[in-house]
């Protein structure tokens, strides 16, 4: 038995989960928030307890030190060396990383070079790797990429209709994201349906503050909604998703909001989506509350959000030539029952239908009516478990 920790490092946060492997038992989990800010918050959950402390954490290395010390303080481990492996979520692996990889040689430098493809994510992911390397230099460190699952896409799906030189020289293509989540829920869907994954055609919908939809055939990603970066695809909490590219030069010419590449990235990544249209919030709970109060902008934002998701599901029904199941996962997909109902009701012609008695808050499993030809499933994602499994597989 070994102890493996799965890490998801954000720019100001560090989410973690400690496993006993190969039993896949969660020993503890937690979240460190507001790294680099005053009054950082560290939360540790274990044995039915939740312990929280507020302190100032300047950087990721200090955050990791506090995490490890908390594990000892709460008698979850006796010493640092009980942890024999650490796995890190990394958003962008480009064409260079086609699978999870042990951190050695120039691996970390390559991860940082790929920050161009995920500027909001890869730098923070790399900071988490460096922090653990500094404090636990001798354990196996593994990077697990959101993009790896999508390397099975055919060229017709991942290439853009731009001059070929931009692909060959600049690697401009669709990479996708959330691959670890899509891979996990596809496998769980096969178990739930009682059929081999190799026999299934699935449309997996990872809908959280960020969101992506993937067409999965025989366990392989054949197309996905996110593109060159996690900005592409469906409308999201603060991201536009797909828009007409000509909007950008137009706004550069006629407004003062788009003067630099940083301006463009800020507006498209942080100020758009549900937040931009509603002028209220990027959180679906806030949007639904505003809709209930009759707020027009929130209602429009919600309708646009559902519309873009329906269109992508329809697109992937065409790509797959039908589907056995549509799977909802992540924060919104798992918890917003009215959202699931509204998405499916608009595409019922394809043979999918939700049973309102099954489609309730907190439900998991099959929420379809008995007569539905395409099953509708709700499956909680577990990206951390996939990461822990990959660490165990790659340990020397």
Swiss-Prot record:
Q: Which reactions fall under this protein's catalytic activity?
A: acetate + ATP = acetyl phosphate + ADP
An example Gene Ontology CC term for this record: cytoplasm
Per the record, the pathway is: Metabolic intermediate biosynthesis; acetyl-CoA biosynthesis; acetyl-CoA from acetate: step 1/2
Show the SUPFAM superfamilies listed in the entry: Actin-like ATPase domain
On the tree of life, the source organism's domain of life is Bacteria
Q: Name one GO molecular function term.
A: magnesium ion binding
Parts of the chain that traverse the membrane: none
Q: What is its EC number?
A: 2.7.2.1
Location of site Transition state stabilizer? Answer: 178, 239
What GO biological process terms does the UniProt entry carry, in alphabetical order? acetate metabolic process; acetyl-CoA biosynthetic process
Q: Does the keyword Coiled coil apply?
A: no
Q: Does the keyword Nucleus apply?
A: no
Q: What class of enzyme is it?
A: transferase
Q: Where does Mg(2+) bind?
A: 8, 383
Q: Where in the cell is it found?
A: Cytoplasm
The alphabetized UniProt keywords are:
ATP-binding, Cytoplasm, Kinase, Magnesium, Metal-binding, Nucleotide-binding, Transferase
Known cofactor(s): Mg(2+); Mn(2+)
PROSITE patterns, per database record: ACETATE_KINASE_1, ACETATE_KINASE_2
Annotated family: Belongs to the acetokinase family.
By its UniProt entry, which NCBIfam families does this protein fall under? ackA (TIGR00016)
Q: How does it assemble?
A: Homodimer.
Put simply, this protein is called Acetate kinase
Instruction: Name the species this protein comes from.
Output: Streptococcus pneumoniae serotype 19F (strain G54)
Which gene name does the record give?
ackA
């Amino acid at each position: 038995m070994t102890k493996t920790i799965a890490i998801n490092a954000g720019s100001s946060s560090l989410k973690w989960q400690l496993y006993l492997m190969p039993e896949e038992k969660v020993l503890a989990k937690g979240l460190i928030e507001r790294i680099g800010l005053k009054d950082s918050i560290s939360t540790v959950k274990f044995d039915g307890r939740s312990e929280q402390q507020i302190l100032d954490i300047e950087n990721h290395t200090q955050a990791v030190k506090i995490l490890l010390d908390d594990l000892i303080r709460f008698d979850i481990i006796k010493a640092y060396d009980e942890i024999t492996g650490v796995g890190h979520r990394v958003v962008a692996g480009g064409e260079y990383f086609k699978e999870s990889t042990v951190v050695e040689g120039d691996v970390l430098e390559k991860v940082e070079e790929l920050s161009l493809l995920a500027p909001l994510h890869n730098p923070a992911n790399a900071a988490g790797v460096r922090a653990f390397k500094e404090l636990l230099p001798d354990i196996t460190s593994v990077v697990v990429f959101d993009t790896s699952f999508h390397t099975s896409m055919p060229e017709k799906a991942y290439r853009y209709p731009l001059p070929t030189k931009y692909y060959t020289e600049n690697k401009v293509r669709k990479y996708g994201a959330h691959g670890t989540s899509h891979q996990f829920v596809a496998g769980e869907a096969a178990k739930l349906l009682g059929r081999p994954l190799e026999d299934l055609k699935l449309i997996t919908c990872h809908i959280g503050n960020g969101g992506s939809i993937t067409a999965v055939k025989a366990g392989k990603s054949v197309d996905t909604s996110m593109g060159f970066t996690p900005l592409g695809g469906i409308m999201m909490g603060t991201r536009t998703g797909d828009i007409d590219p000509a909007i950008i030069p137009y706004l550069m010419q006629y407004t003062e909001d788009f003067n630099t590449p940083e301006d463009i990235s800020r507006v498209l990544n942080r100020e758009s989506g549900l937040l931009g249209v509603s002028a209220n919030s990027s959180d679906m709970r806030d949007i639904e509350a505003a809709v209930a109060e009759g707020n027009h902008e929130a209602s429009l934002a919600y309708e646009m959000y559902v519309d873009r998701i329906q269109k992508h599901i329809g697109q992937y029904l065409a790509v797959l030539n039908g589907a056995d199941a549509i799977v909802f996962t992540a924060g919104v997909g798992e918890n917003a029952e009215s959202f699931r109902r509204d998405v499916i009701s608009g595409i019922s012609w394809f043979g999918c239908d939700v049973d309102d008695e099954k489609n309730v808050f907190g439900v998991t499993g099959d929420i379809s009516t008995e007569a539905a030809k395409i099953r509708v499933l709700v499956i909680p994602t577990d990206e951390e478990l996939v990461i822990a499994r990959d660490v165990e597989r790659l340990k020397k």
